[in-house]
Amino acid sequence: MLELLKVSITGDLSSGKTEACRVFQELGAYVISADKVSHSFLVPHSHIGRRVIDLLGPEVVIDNTFDRKVIAEKVFGNLDLLQALEAILHPEVCRIIEEQYCQVAKERKYPLFIAEVPLLYEIHYARWFDRVILITADENIRRERFTKKTNCSDLNFYQRCARFSSHEEKMMHADIVIENNGTKEELRHKVEEYFYALKGAL
């Protein structure tokens, strides 16, 4: 019997992963975000920060703070540079997620442990989890969400999407698939259903 089910939420860009995680959290699950963890490492004078500066150049730091927009402009569209950055960040992100899981499991306060990991399959991390939930949405819907939220161009959307593995590959390996082409309320109902199903799996 598992003490605390490890669940990863993944999916393509702007599919609704973060919104699904928000609902899980409201229902009582513990939620951690790989993106937020990686952003927490971006401190100029830290060991990780210095490695990022060595890779991308000092211009990514403005007023003693990493400028994520400058970093994005450098790495999206340059796959080699992007993968080199990920090689610095991702092992540390996985370490933090696993440390946090051990801590949360000891506390015995939460019914589920949820980790939002956008590049779950790309970094070969799926096996660590007990279940994988894939959030999907049609490309035109995702593109519209992305451009509306970020004010970035369609080109920027496709550059970022290039880092993700194919939708078909993710569909093949996911345990649960949640389609998110509708409203936030529709997504909430679907997440609630799976929350109680997963909670009952313990």
Curated annotation (Swiss-Prot):
Family, per entry: Belongs to the CoaE family.
Protein name: Dephospho-CoA kinase
Binding site for ATP: S14, S15, G16, K17, T18, E19
EC number of this enzyme: 2.7.1.24
Keyword ATP-binding: yes
Domain DPCK: 6-202
Gene: coaE
Subcellular location: Cytoplasm
Known role: Catalyzes the phosphorylation of the 3'-hydroxyl group of dephosphocoenzyme A to form coenzyme A.
Catalytic activity line of the entry: 3'-dephospho-CoA + ATP = ADP + CoA + H(+)
Pathway(s) it belongs to: Cofactor biosynthesis; coenzyme A biosynthesis; CoA from (R)-pantothenate: step 5/5
Primary location recorded for the protein, binned into one broad class: cytoplasm
One term of GO molecular function: dephospho-CoA kinase activity
GO cellular component, one term: cytoplasm
UniProt keyword list: ATP-binding, Coenzyme A biosynthesis, Cytoplasm, Kinase, Nucleotide-binding, Transferase
Biological processes annotated in GO: coenzyme A biosynthetic process
